[in-house]
Curated annotation (Swiss-Prot):
Protein name: Outer membrane protein A
Membrane disposition: Multi-pass membrane protein
Gene symbol of the encoding locus: ompA
GO molecular function terms noted in the UniProt entry: porin activity
4 X 2 AA approximate tandem repeats of A-P, as annotated region: 208-215
Pfam families xref list: OmpA, OmpA_membrane
Site (Part of salt bridge gating mechanism): 74, 165
HAMAP family xrefs: OmpA
A Gene Ontology cellular-component term: cell outer membrane
Residue ranges of domain OmpA-like in the record: 217-345
Keywords from the named record: Cell outer membrane, Disulfide bond, Ion transport, Membrane, Porin, Repeat, Signal, Transmembrane, Transmembrane beta strand, Transport
Length: 353
């Protein structure tokens, strides 16, 4: 029978195709089995004058815990069958059953296929009854005990939750000869089916999309001399001033002020009264704004503001300059138009691998 069990286990391996049949770590499973139970080396003290039917139907159920890929623990119930002996003078029957506890050691050999061994013990109960001397004497008895248990098998998972196994189990010395009249060994070749709990894959976490980075604000400032744009104390653009603004507009296009904003600031020097100078700087800023709008900058994206004598760039360098003509020339840098452009650049992020 041992040779038959090994041959069947090898045949089961041959049906496999490439990670492991063991359940997921820290999960439970349950199942049942049915097979060929054979009592051997009965050690019977009865002088039987007829056949002893050692080959019987065996069955069982089990419940297990899978600690990891290689190690599990099982508890189960085994019915090892009823072994009758029939003769003209003596006849009777021996039966055994028990609860087993074993460690299950598995090793993956192919896709969804493991080989394993179970090592443990069987707490058994053996019962016997018989009729002797042609029915003149009858006797019965039972015994309990613990015997070592060894099993070898192969297990194939045909879905995540369902698996089938084939194994050969050996239990040594069941019963006591003086109590139940026999002390057989038992081999059980069985086919089983198990259901595994908790094998569903965990749902993938929902990853929120990475928000698009905020656009980068690109700010540039241009300074144009009023003497180039306008005549002295004037607010009308000169031809040379229009040419200067044409060149400036070409640079503004690269910043794309349509998606940003443009601020035109007009400045005056300190010659004259502050109020007229403020009004002049405003008119000059308006002239530059209107010209840039005519070139294509949206009117709602550009503003003009006169600053008058504020923020002079000459400081006190012209304090002692005379006569007036020389002072006007010295203060020329203060007479200016500044254009501040804010554009927005999109940040392009590389997709993650």
């Amino acid at each position: 029978m041992k040779k038959t069990a090994i041959a069947l286990a090898v045949a089961l391996v041959g049906f496999a195709t490439v990670a492991q049949a063991a359940p997921k770590d820290n999960t439970w499973y349950t199942g049942g089995k049915l097979g060929w139970s054979q009592y051997q080396d009965t050690g019977s003290i009865i002088n039987n004058d007829g056949p002893t039917h050692k080959d019987q139907l065996g069955a069982g159920a089990f419940f297990g815990y899978q600690a990891n890929q290689y190690l599990g623990f099982e508890m189960g119930y085994d019915w090892l069958g009823r072994m009758p002996y029939k003769g003209d003078i003596n006849n009777g029957a021996f039966k055994a059953q028990g609860v087993q506890l074993a460690a299950k050691l598995s090793y993956p050999v192919a896709q969804d296929l493991d080989v394993y061994t179970r090592l443990g013990g069987l707490v058994w109960r053996a019962d016997a009854k018989g009729s002797f001397d042609g029915g003149l004497d009858r006797a019965s008895g039972h015994d309990t005990g613990v015997s070592p248990l060894v099993a070898l098998g192969a297990e194939y998972a045909w879905t995540k939750n369902w698996a089938t196994r084939m194994e050969y189990q050996w239990v040594n010395n069941i019963g006591d000869r003086e109590t139940v009249g026999a002390r057989p060994d038992n081999g059980l070749l069985s086919v089983g089916v198990s259901y595994r709990f908790g094998q569903e894959d965990a749902a993938a976490p929902i990853v929120a999309p990475t928000p698009a980075p905020a656009p980068i604000v690109d700010t540039k400032r241009f300074t144009l001399k009023s003497d180039v744009l306008f005549g002295f104390n004037k607010a009308n653009l000169k031809p040379e001033g229009q040419q200067a603004l044409d060149q400036l507009y070409a640079q503004l296009s690269s910043i794309d002020p349509k998606d940003g904003s443009v601020v035109v600031l007009g400045f005056a020097d300190r010659i004259g009264q502050p109020a007229p100078n403020l009004a002049l700087s405003q008119r000059r800023a308006d002239s530059v704004r209107d010209y840039l709008v005519s070139k294509g900058i949206p009117a709602d994206k550009i503003t003009a503001r006169g600053e008058g004598q504020a923020n002079p760039v000459t400081g006190n360098t012209c304090d002692n300059v005379k006569p007036r003509a020389a002072l006007i020339e010295c203060l020329a840098p203060d007479r200016r138009v500044e254009i501040e452009v804010k554009g927005y650049k999109e940040v392009v992020t590389q997709p993650q691998a």
